[in-house]
């Protein structure tokens, strides 16, 4: 009798779960489709293939790196090209670049050589062959600390190279065990690095030594630093956390239910307690902090399977500007998008 009851109970449980599933499917089917999110401004800068893109601090300028040694800067307000540098001035095998916050200076790099550019005059401001310092390693990331003379290089050997061309001083610090893929300077001037080893480091620039570290299980794909030393860290599989680097503690975690998903670019909103992320493609999500709940979702324009958001900046507290690998610049009213979602 007990056995019969158990079988009956299991069967009933299966029917109940099936009924719940059917009701859920019907409810989802009856749910009205959300209104499409439209940009409030769009401009296709180019239809040429892009290696890299960067926006200035408030999104007023866009720098694009093209194959075969071409580097160009546009004024996004006037939609005019300000700088157009070509090979052989730009080394043909240049594979990465960085623009300082003011858009006055650019860094570009091959595997071993860094070039510095003055965007106001479209003239080279310096060149540095780091082969001797790198050894068998190569450049994997770069960023100005104080443009144009002071900058930092991440390498495939896990080293951080602090360079100052004015004083001709170079310091190599080893902390990572794999490629250093992210370098970022916080609003208050703190330097952070992240690598394919899952290590995130907050650096003491004066002593060229780590102040705090955080380790996540997999390679770091997204790194963003906001106010109050709050750092967003996402790895390649399932870790998306807010790290308070001053106190070295995790203060929030995104409620992200999909495994094997990751983020590429992220920005903290300047006024609202929000974090905005982009997927490896063009999906955009607004997250409510500190709860870590998603409150809105939309997609930037994609013109192909490989389209992705390469950078984003707030032009003002309410407007986010994105630039994609298709050369498309779009503006988004973030408050309006959140309001449309019904979560704001």
Where do the PLM segments sit?
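WD40-repeat beta-propeller superdomains and closely related acidic/aromatic-rich repeat-like regions
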Residues: 29-344
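Sec-dependent bacterial lipoprotein signal peptides
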Residues: 1-30
């Amino acid at each position: 009798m007990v056995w019969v009851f158990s079988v009956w109970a299991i069967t009933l449980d299966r029917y109940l779960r099936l009924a719940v599933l059917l009701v859920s499917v019907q409810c989802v089917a009856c749910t009205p489709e959300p209104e499409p999110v439209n940009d409030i401004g769009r401009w296709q800068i180019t239809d040429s293939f892009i290696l890299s893109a960067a926006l200035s601090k408030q999104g007023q300028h866009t720098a694009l790196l093209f194959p075969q040694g071409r580097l160009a800067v546009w004024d996004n307000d006037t939609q005019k090209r300000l700088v157009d540098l070509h090979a052989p001035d730009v080394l043909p095998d240049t594979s990465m670049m960085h623009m300082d916050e003011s858009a006055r200076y650019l860094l570009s790099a091959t595997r071993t050589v860094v070039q510095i550019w003055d965007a106001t005059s479209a003239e080279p401001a310096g060149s540095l062959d780091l082969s001797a310092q790198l050894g068998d390693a190569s450049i994997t990331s770069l960023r100005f600390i104080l443009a144009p003379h002071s900058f930092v290089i991440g390498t495939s050997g896990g080293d951080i190279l602090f360079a100052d061309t004015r004083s001709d001083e170079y310091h190599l610090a080893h902390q990572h065990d794999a490629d250093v893929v992210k370098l970022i300077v916080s609003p208050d001037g703190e330097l952070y690095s992240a690598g394919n080893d899952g290590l995130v480091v907050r650096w003491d620039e004066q002593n060229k030594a780590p102040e705090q570290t955080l380790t996540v299980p997999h390679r770091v794909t997204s790194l963003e630093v906001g106010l109050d030393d709050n750092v967003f860290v996402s790895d390649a599989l399932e870790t998306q956390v807010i790290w308070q680097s001053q106190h070295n503690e995790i203060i929030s975690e995104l409620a992200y239910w999909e495994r094997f998903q990751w983020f590429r670019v992220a920005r903290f909103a300047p006024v609202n307690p929000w974090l905005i992320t982009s997927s490896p493609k063009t999906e955009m999500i607004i997250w409510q902090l500190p709860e870590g709940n998603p409150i809105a979702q939309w997609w930037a324009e994609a013109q192909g399977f490989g389209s992705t958001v390469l950078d984003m900046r707030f032009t003002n507290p309410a407007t986010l500007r994105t630039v994609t690998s298709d050369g498309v610049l779009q503006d988004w009213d973030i408050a309006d998008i959140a309001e449309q979602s019904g979560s704001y």
